[in-house]
Design a protein with these regions (language model features):
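N-terminal secretory signal peptides that target proteins for export/translocation
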Residues: 1-5
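Alpha-solenoid helical repeat scaffolds
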Residues: 6-766
Length: 766
């Protein structure tokens, strides 16, 4: 009996274990476990974790429509729009009757300005769900995107009539009414939304934002405090209240309030990060970095804290620390897009722009909508000298992230480089809209107006820049620039000095003050001013650069210029401007080999600076070291393929060394396109055409070179006359040939090809 009982027990246990193993391998069970886990994370607002679990569910069953839909909702919460779109699309493919997914898809397409495709989904929804209030809300969104606000309001009102208890509809109606300046009606509907769902934080905050926009600041503060009471654990109303304080100029109150938020929400990542984010947003990188360093030590497992700390370390140029922490992030998740963007930033700062483009393009393959990745990819292309591609990336950045102010600043800088003042004004307006309390937008718009001699609006913007940021040098520098252009030197001097009082390290202020003295032919005063400021700020590479420039260009003091520029380079090995000028000084004093050594050392710290290779090539050319000159120019073109100066010089060297004439022609044409006003570019292209036997075309270009030199008041170039004389000889115009060949020897009796000139003249006489 006992043996039989034991056998039965073993049999039962065996069956139970078999059943358990079978269940654990059942794909439907596994799918459901992942789905339920994802739902729990979603309910706790842990959307990244939810997306992983929903992703696991659809990996087990790729046709699990509800899993795809919940994954889409997670991506929407994470603002990963492309992936959300893909999952919504997959949802309606698998379950065409999931009309809520179609509504979400239509709204996402509207947000992405794909109105045609959105209309197709809305047409289907109207035919299938004509009385669904959310369908009419989507129609209202579409009409709003088409700027038809009256029709949009009618649709949202229809949505309310179909679903009068939906607080979201009242909120959307209020937002539309605010856009059409129906402010009183908007207030009523915002209050209705709050009444219908007091827990709806979006409605609570929208009402506070309404009061703030109407400058009813006391009511705004009261509303935000009510929102805090509604959900004491939510960081959102606290963030809104902090922004209100900041908008009122209550910086110290904001700081103290956020310190309290950190104490109130010790377990909420958004809450305890607010203080560090405040320091970052207000430009206090030292405090922000210190705060995040402390947060990282307190919350080492908080990935967002770690990421924000990495970003701050990059901005502080503490690259080794940033690299170490970021490598840890990528080791944990090689496809972490934020960490890939950080790696790209580090590579840019290391001067490895080519590597940065590869890293950032990988990030964009994972998330094509990443405005931040587009922005930094633009910086990498800019470092490589590809401004057109850089601007394209920056435009993509602001398309996906319109609030990304740094991308608007980059576009402003690009417009300034191109001399496109209309584009600069547009970018300045974007900066102003995003940061009305920053002086930068006003200053940029002032720059565009000064360039177009619109002095009155420029001065108005400058006064506004000073008003919003009286402790910043930005407004005072622009006031100095305006007065300098107007030749009001006393006022210019005063403005620049005020800027230096606000920020003794301001290179723009010191440079402007020195230019004011130079404009009055007072170089000694400019030098004295530079030395005076250097005595206050002794570690500024830029200040020594300014001093060296005046000593070189205005005082012709080669020894003093060399000492100042060497100090500038010593303080900042990446100061390419100082290094380039240092080489020029060394060339001027006849130390060609020393200049070459300077450029070679400079390249080690600035490997992507094509100018060093071009100048080095010119020095090798002067030594008749053709191969090294050729290699240097080619390296410059590897970095900047369309660089006109490198193209011109390489074409000329190829002709001098018997290189491929067709390749030289292509290079010379590139140079001519890039430098249409350059006598040298016209001469080089003419010389290539001479080699190809197109003598009349060559003559036209040599004549153009002479005209351009005369126009720019450049000294007569014996080489152009030599080339023109030879071309006239080939064109059988001996009188003109003799005239230009004789001119060569008058300009420079010791011309390098003087013997060939005399030989040609002798042949013409015979």
């Amino acid at each position: 009996m006992r043996l039989s009982s034991i056998c039965r027990l073993v049999l039962v246990l065996g069956l139970a274990i078999t059943s358990f193993v079978a269940c654990s391998r059942d794909p439907n069970v596994r799918k459901q476990k992942y789905f339920e886990s994802g739902q729990r994370y979603f309910d706790k607002e842990k959307y990244r974790e939810a997306s992983i679990q929903f992703g696991n569910a659809v990996q087990v069953d790729p046709r699990f429509a509800q899993g795809h839909y919940r994954l889409a909702q997670s991506f929407l919460k994470l603002q990963q729009w492309t992936r959300a779109y893909q999952e919504l699309n997959r949802t309606v493919e698998l379950d065409p009757e999931n009309y809520q997914a179609r509504v979400d898809l239509a709204n996402l397409l509207i947000a992405g300005h794909d109105l045609k495709q959105a209309q197709e989904h809305i047409d289907l929804l109207l035919s299938k769900q004509p009385n669904d209030p959310q369908v009419h809300e989507a129609i209202a969104n579409l009409l709003s995107a088409q700027q038809d606000f009256p029709a949009a309001i009618k649709e949202i009102q229809k949505s309310i009539s179909l679903g009068p208890d939906r607080w979201e509809a009242y909120l959307n109606l209020a937002l539309l009414q605010m856009r059409t300046n129906q402010m009183d009606a908007a207030e009523g509907n915002l209050k209705k939304a709050v009444q219908l769902n007091p827990q709806a934080m979006n409605a609570q905050l929208a009402l506070g934002g309404y009061y703030q926009a109407r400058n009813r600041l006391t009511e705004a503060e009261e509303q935000y405090r009510r929102a805090i009471n509604v959900d004491a654990k939510s960081p959102d109303p606290r963030a809104a209240l902090a922004k209100l304080y900041l908008a009122e100029g209550k910086r110290s109150e904001t700081e103290e309030f956020l310190k309290q938020v950190k104490r109130d929400l010790p377990e909420n990542s958004v809450g305890y990060r607010m203080l560090g984010d405040f320091y970052f947003a207000t430009g206090d990188l030292d405090k922000a970095t210190a705060e995040y360093g402390m947060l990282y030590s307190e919350h080492p497992k908080d990935v967002q804290v770690k990421k924000n700390y990495v970003q701050l370390l990059i901005l502080k140029n503490r690259l080794d620390e940033a690299r170490k922490l970021n490598d840890e992030l990528l080791k944990a998740n090689p496809n972490d897009n934020e960490a890939l963007v950080y790696r790209g930033q580090i590579q840019i700062r290391d001067g490895h722009a080519n590597e940065a483009t590869q890293t950032l393009q990988t990030a964009l393959k994972n998330d094509p909508d990443s405005g931040v990745a587009h922005f930094h990819l633009g910086l990498a292309f800019d470092q490589l000298g590809n401004l057109a591609r850089a601007e394209s990336e920056w435009r993509d950045a602001v398309r996906w992230r319109p609030e990304l102010v740094e991308a608007h600043r980059a576009l402003a800088a690009a417009a300034l480089r191109r001399g496109d003042m209309d584009a600069l004004e547009q970018s300045a307006k974007q900066v102003l809209d995003l940061q009305p309390l920053s002086p930068d937008g006003y200053a940029l718009r002032a720059v565009s107006n000064i360039a177009r001699k619109r002095f009155a609006p420029a001065e108005e913007d400058i006064h506004k820049a000073i008003e919003v940021a009286p402790q910043s040098p930005v407004g005072y520098v622009q006031m100095g620039n305006l007065k300098l252009v107007q030749k009001q030197f006393v006022e210019a001097e005063k403005a620049y000095q005020q800027a230096l009082e606000k920020d003794p390290r301001s290179t723009d202020a010191l440079g402007g003050l020195m230019n004011t003295y130079l404009a009055q032919n007072q170089p000694d005063k400019a030098v004295a001013t530079a030395n005076s400021q250097i005595s206050k700020v002794s570690n500024s590479s830029a200040f020594y650069d300014l001093l060296g420039t005046v000593l070189l260009n205005n005082k012709k003091d080669m020894k003093g210029a060399e000492a100042a520029l060497k100090k500038a380079a010593e303080l900042d090995k990446n100061n390419s401007d100082a290094l380039l000028k240092l080489g020029r000084v060394q060339v001027a004093k006849g130390a060609t080999d020393e200049a070459i050594a300077t450029y070679q050392n400079s390249i080690k710290n600035n490997p992507n600076e094509a100018s060093f290779y071009i100048l080095m090539g010119e020095l090798y050319e002067s030594k008749k070291d053709w191969q090294k000159a050729k290699d240097a120019y080619q390296k410059a073109l590897d970095l900047k393929p369309d660089n006109p100066l490198a193209s011109n010089n390489l074409a000329y060297v190829m002709l001098e060394t018997g290189g491929n004439v067709d390749v030289a022609l292509s290079l010379a044409q590139t140079a001519r396109r890039g430098m249409p006003d350059s006598p040298n570019a016209a001469d080089t292209l003419g010389w290539v055409l001479y080699q190809k036997g197109a003598y009349q075309s060559a003559i036209d270009l040599f004549q153009e070179a002479l005209k351009l030199a005369e126009k720019t008041k450049a000294p007569e170039d014996a080489t152009v006359h030599y080339h023109l004389g030879l071309a006239y000889e080939k064109a059988e115009k001996p009188t003109l040939a003799r005239q230009h060949l004789e001119r060569v020897l008058k300009i420079n009796p010791n011309y390098s090809a003087a013997d060939d000139v005399r030989k040609a003249l002798a042949q013409l006489k015979s």
